[in-house]
Amino acid sequence: MIIIIPTIVIVTLVLILLLGKIIMRFNFRKQVKVLYENTENISGQHYDSSKLNDLPEPVQRYFRSVLKDGQSYISSVHLKHNGLFKTDLEKGFIKITGEQYFSVLLPQFIWKGTTLMFTAIDRYITDQGSLKVYLFDLFKVVDGKGSAINEGELQRWMAESVWFPTNLLPSNMVKWTTIDANSAKLSFSYKEISFHFLVTFNAIGEITTMQTERYMTDKKRETWICKMSNYKEVNGIRIPFSAEVIWRLSTGDHSYANFEVQKIEYNKY
């Protein structure tokens, strides 16, 4: 038996889906506006390699590799990427596109990841983190928030600082400690949240991995690893254009995100 769906039903469904996309776009832009309203312009500060001498040797190597003397500090970032993503470690990869905004002096970001069926909004704005996932831009299926989410979002912001490396320079939030010739400890502290990363570097100074312990559930942390590669120069700054994100569990390493940067802009308001 052939089932014929009335044209009015099809048109109604299309209009509902279109409305969902319009509402999603509007809400995303509204949150970006809040992020920018809380962004302070620090581009008047400039990188000076002569101030690196007290840092661990591989960290000095990194900054000399990715920054040039006189480089303006980065205040804000707008980034677009494509890639592959897993909604569950037991499932296969699906295609994803992403758009993301960062502020630097105040830790903030918002990311919108879009797949064929789902849209995810991951954010940390005005000291509040959240992860929300929508089916067809309309039906909320995930609504994560709380202290574990707040910490995880700040860890994401810190790891993704490789895309705006002046944020990795020593500050009241960021400290570096020596480990060995090719690794260092990055300690981060902001208000009541503190954590550290084990950061590894290659021979030419590029950061290749950042590893920390991150909440995988509300109650349990697991090893979380970001791998960076394919460094290219943008506006005099060398950044990785390829990133892979992995959970290291008792069952082994589980890759769940592979992103390729398509566009990045600095200090645009």
Placement of each model-derived feature along the sequence:
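Short, hydrophobic/aromatic-rich segments at coil-to-beta transitions
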Residues: 74-80, 104-111, 179-187, 208-209, ...
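N-terminal mature ectodomain segment of secretory-pathway/periplasmic proteins
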Residues: 60-140
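Short, exposed beta-strand/loop patches in secreted or surface proteins that constitute
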Residues: 99-103, 122-124, 173-179, 199, ...
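N-terminal membrane-anchoring alpha-helices
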Residues: 1-40
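Gly/Pro-enriched, hydrophobic low-complexity segments
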Residues: 184-266
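N-terminal leader/targeting segments and the immediate start of mature chains
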Residues: 28-78
